[in-house]
Amino acid sequence: MPLYEVEQETERVILVGVSQQDGDDAEDSVAELAELVETAGAVVVGTLIQKRENIHPGTYVGTGKVFELEELIEETGATGIVCDDELSPAQLKNLEEALKTKVMDRTLIILDIFAARASTSEGKIQVELAQLKYRLSRLSGLGRSLSRLGGGIGTRGPGEKKLEMDRRLINSRVAQLNRELKEVQRHREVNRQQRKRSGIPVVAVVGYTNAGKSTLLNHLTNAEVLEEDKLFATLDPTTRILELTNNQKVLMTDTVGFIRKLPHHLIDAFQIGRASCRERV
């Protein structure tokens, strides 16, 4: 046993959101973001929500709020901020330069959780592809932010491997992953056709993340799907047989849960779950 154990310091972050009209769900959305951040392994030390008609194109929040964030970072000892919407490359770069701290957004946090949860070959490929495509347009801001702070949230790929930061190598890796994905999906299609020929009805358990879908599947089928009081405890669909009282059988599949503000380009990370649902229509 080693004499000393080096533990990675827990990241301390401030959540930042924009409320664009009275009665919107900005507060609920930021509360959900807090759950995401905690699931990713960080601690929330502050929250700032600005009311404004439109998200600032350059810095997400207005200039005055950027100054407030500087003060809040100093007061709380925060190691970074997390914005409740996906930041553009310019917003990421400008905030990182203004605040001199690690800048993240909702998409980066979700991808980090996906990377930790993916267990199948297809899931890992889909997640890494989504992570690399997200990084490609943001290498400037992300590079400074992540390299200075030594990694942590946003640097972890599937299996805890460190994600590539070089543009040329990222493009090469994306091409390789696309080839691997086509092969994996070809095998999945063969399995789907076999299930279809069996004539057994298939049911997808669909709902919000952390709503209890895995618990329901375990209760009905005596499966042993991971149950946790965390967002995205399930990333890869699990299929089990349910025997009904009339000796009829159905196949039940646990799917990835829904969540607010999931960017369209990130839907690819849900491809497995979406394909599972399409089978049942």
Please identify what each model-predicted range represents.
Residues 4-13, 142-268, 274-278:
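Conserved G1/Walker A P-loop phosphate-binding module
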Residues 108-130:
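Short alpha-helix plus adjacent loop in nuclease-associated cores
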Residues 33, 132, 170:
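A residue-level signal for conserved active-site and pocket-lining positions in enzyme catalytic cores
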Residues 1-112:
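N-terminal accessory targeting/assembly segments
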Residues 23-26, 59-63, 85-86, 118, ...:
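Conserved phosphate/pyrophosphate-binding and hydrolysis machinery centered on Walker-type P-loop NTPases
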Residues 64-66, 267-270:
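Charged helix-capping and loop-helix junction motifs
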Residues 71-82, 133-145:
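Extended, charge-rich low-complexity interaction segments
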Residues 125, 132-135, 139, 177, ...:
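Non-transmembrane amphipathic alpha-helical segments
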